[in-house]
Amino acid sequence: MRALSEKSGKNSYGLGSFWNGCHSRSERGQEISVLAWVDIEANTAYALSVEQTPGDEGKRQRKRKRKGKANSSAKANAKAKGDKSKSRNANYLDQVCRVASQVKSESLKYLLTDGAYSNKDFIDGVVASGLHQIGKLRRDSQLRYLYEGARRPGPGRSKCYDGVMDVEDLSRFDCLELDKETDLYIKTLNHPRFKRDLRVVVVVNTKTGGYALLFSTDTSLDARTIYEYYKARFQIEFIFRDAKQFTGLGDCQARSREKLATHFNLSLSALNLAKVEQAAANEPDAAFSMASLKRRMFNQHLIDRILSHLDCGQSLEKFSDEYSALCNYGIISQQAA
């Protein structure tokens, strides 16, 4: 997942024009790419890796190369800087491959992405790294049915495909009624542009008639699993929200690449530690709220200050029974405390 952070000035590393999903347009700023570990059972996510996306300098270098106007010194600098001459999609893929090679776990099998990462180069790279990708396809994707009939005898190539999928006719799909307003249709189809078979789930809103196309490179998954996994991807959005509101993700005034990287890592690490603290408090199933945690820590500090000025020990019986209740005063949810 990617997040855009506004940044004033002209000399900070990574400044460029990046897509802002909140405003549905490109805006100038700095972008970070975050890989997160999603806990499906606890319905939360932990930041695993954060890297800053190179800015527009890499684009300018590629344009000069295509036009043949780059001099020898510019080419040498581009070669020395390495990742700046790559496309942004290649930088995202490099990050995934590095993390996949470093994290050895049987539970790490799937990479959950949005539609921006649904392209052939990225999918091929993810599969080559040993992972399966679950993501979203364009609504107008041309998908082909696999031929399931008898093979004809004799020489020549056998029939492989059996027509193009029509969203208006899903009779050849297996249907699962998820709830009163949502039906899931699943089928293994071929994507000609990706040149591979995908497990495709058509999510249909029976009330409005709208639909979305989800996919998985693992053709053994069922419709509910693909849907639940893709829905869990949105927990990463809460990482950006909490980090920007409470741990200063977008407040760094540094300009160098190294200092910015340190700031981004510290901001997301603080958020991870807050979630680990809640899990260690024997509340693994409680809803996480950074605002409630901040309020509770403030209340605890205030009570301790008052007791210290009154020269009263916290172990006194008249304080010990109500201490926890006072610490929880003003929190959003008792479960989040």
Where do the model's predicted regions map?
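Charge-patterned, long linear interaction tracts outside catalytic cores
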Residues: 193-220
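Active-site-proximal, Lys/Arg-enriched surface segment
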Residues: 2-55, 61-63, 182-185
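An internal, acidic/charged active-site-proximal segment
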Residues: 65-200, 281, 286-288, 335-337
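Long, low-complexity C-terminal extensions of enzymes
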Residues: 283-286, 292-337
